[in-house]
């Protein structure tokens, strides 16, 4: 099934300007026609006049119907919101394609996949019907649209035929509940609370600026911010931009900026915090968007299935990332169950850590988990030399937690110091570099099997560099890597066929995502800084043994998580209303 609907770029009523949810729930929305292809039958299109009759028939049999869409969130929300149609199973060829290792730079649109499989291309005349209602179209334009919609439905069906033999059956269930979190939403948003969050965030930023006696433009300008730091006696680090020019290293991701956030000088620390706060409008924008959504209906939770490259985890979409809502933050608290129903929050406790140690063969740590021992207190006791418990030693236990959770992927002492200062794993701690080195060494000495997997990852990379990916067969953490692909328990694969080695930088890279910069030179620059920038702009990221272990652990955790959700869905009919990497929120009676 494939929908065609009214849109009007002249007034901003277009998916380029607003979210899918706002577009579909808008009073301006008008379904024009629906392309349909039943199995074993000729494709056709349902006219606007025939849509009510068509869906009356479909609803009578919806418990037996499997529907195929390309970008199912869009089409399935139209089905449910406007026509109360909820089939037995929803398949999405876009979600399937995203999981099946197509080239990173290839578009996965219906038209692009049609061309890839040598299927006739799309013919919908979008340029001819923009701004036109069904009643305003002549018979010729209507025929063009109906033929194009029918062709799109046929193409989605043929693409599905090609993808299904490659796709794990269990993951089809995962796609279904991922789509329904958006197309059949369950959570209710507390509108007033979202509006209050947005107002409070604006006030917080204004108060920060007032406390410093500065204006927003002074902090958002890199040059002016650097001048303020210089006046305070802070030596500003510089970095090369894409053109090779030196600029202040004051981006959020720069290590110098992270040092400022951890500065012992409270004024410098406040300056850095305020700069990041006023440069970002994410919090109030998100709260405002959620407030608007809650006024239109239940909260449509959008996830890209396998959106996170080389981990197969979900990622955010439709201008919202539901994955990174603070678990104890005000926005989460403003998400409610429908009247007379309840929310159940289920968490796969320490899943990454458990899988990392179990798959690596670090059996002593696994046994401590099995015995119910607090592994974080155990680490802290080893580090500090006295018995640590959760009640009396929260700071020390936090460091023990950081040892277990951050050192498993090759974390070094400098990063350990900066992470401790952020208070991610417990109360913020200012560690000396030597203390961090001791903590890192403790992990590596007590997790020799995990460290061995890092080394195995390095060996695999070196072998790929020597002989290529084709014909290779390796094992990492019990998972087979054949021909450059890691084959997960579900049957999905992680793609490492793009790994390459830069001899000058002595660094491996892999194609992580689409190139975000146009006109990047085809040849690699000579200068070291320029080479790093070139790889980054081409969509590549660094890769090393411990990073491969991290990606594989997260991928295995994602598979385990989806399998658990599938079991609950199939046995009890409950699907996640919202989920994160290791947590699911269910709505129950």
Give the ranges of each region predicted by the language model.
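Conserved pre-motif C helix in the palm subdomain of viral-like polymerases
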Residues: 151-157, 349, 545-566
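Conserved "right-hand" nucleotidyltransferase catalytic core of DNA-directed polymerases
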Residues: 1-4, 8-13, 18, 26-33, ...
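Short beta-strand-to-loop capping motifs
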Residues: 586-589
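Metal-dependent catalytic core segments for phosphate chemistry
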Residues: 19, 28-30, 345, 352-386, ...
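Short active-site loop/helix that positions an aromatic residue
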Residues: 73-84, 97-101, 225-233, 349-363, ...
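Function-dense linear segments that define catalytic or interfacial modules
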Residues: 305-389
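Active-site palm subdomain of RNA-directed nucleic acid polymerases
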Residues: 163-175, 560-584
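Active-site-proximal helix-loop-helix substrate-binding element of RNase H-like nuclease domains
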Residues: 29-55, 59-164, 175, 377-385, ...
């Amino acid at each position: 099934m494939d929908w065609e609907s009214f849109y009007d770029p002249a007034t901003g009523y277009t998916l380029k300007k607003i979210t899918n949810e706002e577009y579909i729930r808008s009073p301006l929305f008008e379904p024009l026609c629906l392309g349909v292809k039943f199995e074993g039958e000729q494709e056709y299109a349902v006219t606007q006049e025939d849509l009510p009759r068509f869906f009356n028939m479909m609803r009578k049999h919806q418990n037996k119907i499997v529907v195929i869409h390309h970008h199912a969130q869009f089409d399935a929300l139209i089905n449910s919101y406007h026509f109360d149609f909820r089939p037995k199973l929803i398949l999405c060829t876009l979600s399937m394609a995203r999981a099946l290792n197509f080239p990173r730079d290839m578009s996965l649109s219906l038209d692009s996949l049609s061309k890839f499989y040598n299927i006739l291309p799309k013919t919908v005349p979008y340029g001819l019907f923009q701004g036109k209602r069904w009643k305003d179209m002549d018979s010729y334009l209507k025929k063009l649209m109906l033929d194009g919609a029918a062709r799109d439905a046929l193409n989605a069906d043929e693409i599905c035929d090609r993808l299904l033999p490659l796709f794990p059956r269990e993951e089809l269930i995962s796609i279904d509940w991922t789509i329904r979190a958006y197309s059949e939403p369950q959570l209710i948003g507390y509108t007033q609370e979202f509006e209050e969050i947005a107002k409070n965030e604006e006030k917080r930023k204004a108060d920060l600026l007032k406390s410093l006696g500065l204006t927003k433009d002074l902090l958002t300008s890199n040059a002016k911010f650097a001048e303020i730091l210089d006046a305070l006696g802070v030596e500003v680090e510089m970095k090369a931009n894409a053109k090779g020019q030196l600029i202040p290293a004051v981006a959020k991701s720069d290590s110098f900026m992270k040092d400022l956030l951890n500065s012992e000088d409270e004024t410098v620390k406040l300056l850095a915090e305020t700069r990041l706060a006023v440069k970002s409008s994410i919090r109030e924008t998100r709260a405002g968007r959620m407030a608007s959504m809650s006024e239109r209906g239940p909260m449509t939770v959008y996830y890209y299935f396998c959106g996170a490259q080389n981990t197969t985890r979900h990622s955010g979409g439709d201008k919202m990332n539901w994955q990174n809502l603070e678990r104890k933050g005000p926005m989460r608290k403003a998400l409610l169950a429908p009247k007379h129903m309840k929310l159940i929050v289920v968490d796969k406790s320490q899943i990454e850590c458990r899988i990392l140690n179990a798959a690596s063969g670090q059996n002593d740590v696994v046994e401590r988990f099995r015995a119910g021992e607090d592994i974080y207190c155990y680490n802290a006791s080893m580090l500090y030399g006295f018995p640590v418990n959760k009640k009396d030693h929260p700071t020390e236990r936090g460091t023990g937690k950081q040892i277990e959770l951050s050192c498993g992927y090759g974390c070094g002492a400098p990063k350990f110091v900066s992470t401790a200062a952020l208070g991610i794993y417990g109360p913020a701690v200012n560690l000396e570099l030597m203390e961090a080195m001791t903590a890192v060494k403790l992990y590596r000495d007590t997790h020799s099997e995990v460290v061995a997997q890092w080394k195995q990852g390095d060996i695999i990379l070196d072998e790929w560099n020597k002989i290529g990916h084709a014909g290779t067969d390796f094992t990492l953490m019990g998972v087979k890597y054949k021909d450059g692909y890691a084959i997960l328990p579900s049957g999905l694969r992680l793609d490492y066929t793009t790994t390459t080695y830069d001899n000058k930088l002595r660094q491996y890279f892999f194609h992580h995502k689409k190139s975000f910069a146009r006109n990047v030179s085809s040849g690699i620059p000579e200068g070291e800084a320029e080479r790093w920038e070139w790889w980054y702009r081409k969509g590549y990221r660094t890769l090393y043994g411990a990073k491969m272990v991290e990606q594989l652990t997260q991928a295995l955790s994602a598979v385990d998580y989806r399998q658990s959700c599938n079991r609950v869905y199939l046995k009890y009919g409950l699907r996640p209303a919202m989920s994160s990497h290791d947590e699911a929120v269910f709505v129950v009676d």
